[in-house]
Amino acid sequence: SCKDWELYHQAGLDSLYETVGNLNLFLICKRPEPSALRPLPEGCSIRTCRPDELDVWKHLAAEDSYADSLTDYYERVYAGNGEEQNPAFFQRCLFLCTPSGKPVATGLTWLSYARTGFPVNTLGWIRVLPGEEGRGFGRALLSELLRRSDFPLYLHTQPTSVCAIRLYSDFGFHLLTNPVIGYRKNDLNASLPILEKVMRPAAFHGLRFSNEGQALHQAALSSRISEF
């Protein structure tokens, strides 16, 4: 998001932003931090994505320039077995709506690698629409997703997602230290010096770590398609 880029800009790391966006970070939450959970902002509501709202989800989940990539990802990971639609996706994909009913944020939990016999709970595609940030929507949505989830819960992100990493840390997520997860390198060691420069000191020193990524690693090895 724009704010993440501004943090890199303020740290004099503009030139690294695009490259760093290709680095992999993996996190685990064994149990959410209760003090981080928040109620919905007044008048807002949460509902599931309807089968006729895939285009709405794509617009919420990523910048419009990534629509084709998101369509491909949906078809490979969420639609499943060549089906056009998978009811499980629409049961798990949440929209946060303003009092007027407008969806402004989305996120979902998913049972990744279930088809290959190594099911793990993952969190993904959490995003608040630009212009709607800073109003507590992301924190409220993540609270609801965690209330509905099984654990441990894993996610994949990049060191350019500074604000999200801080949010995940508040909710009890720990950065995995395992050097490889499935077929992807874990770029934690390369990312930490950068994060130290772009995060507030208290937030950076509040990061926690875990070496409990073996189950996720084994699950991710079961398919060449990255399901989270």
Predicted regions and their residues:
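Conserved beta-strand-loop-alpha-helix junction that forms the acyl-donor binding cleft
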Residues: 1-4, 155-165, 181-192
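Acyl-donor-binding surface of acyltransferase catalytic domains
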Residues: 1-42
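Conserved acetyl-CoA-binding loop of GNAT-fold acetyltransferases
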Residues: 13-19, 146, 169-178
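A short beta-loop-alpha structural element at the N-terminal edge
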Residues: 45-57
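Hydrophobic adenine-recognition pocket in adenosine-nucleotide-binding enzymes
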Residues: 49, 126-128, 157
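A conserved beta-strand-loop-helix scaffold within acyl/acetyltransferase catalytic domains
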Residues: 62-128
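Conserved acetyl-CoA-binding loop-helix of GNAT-fold acetyltransferases
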Residues: 128, 134-147, 166-170
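Acidic/histidine-enriched, glycine/proline-rich intrinsically disordered or flexible terminal extensions
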Residues: 186-228
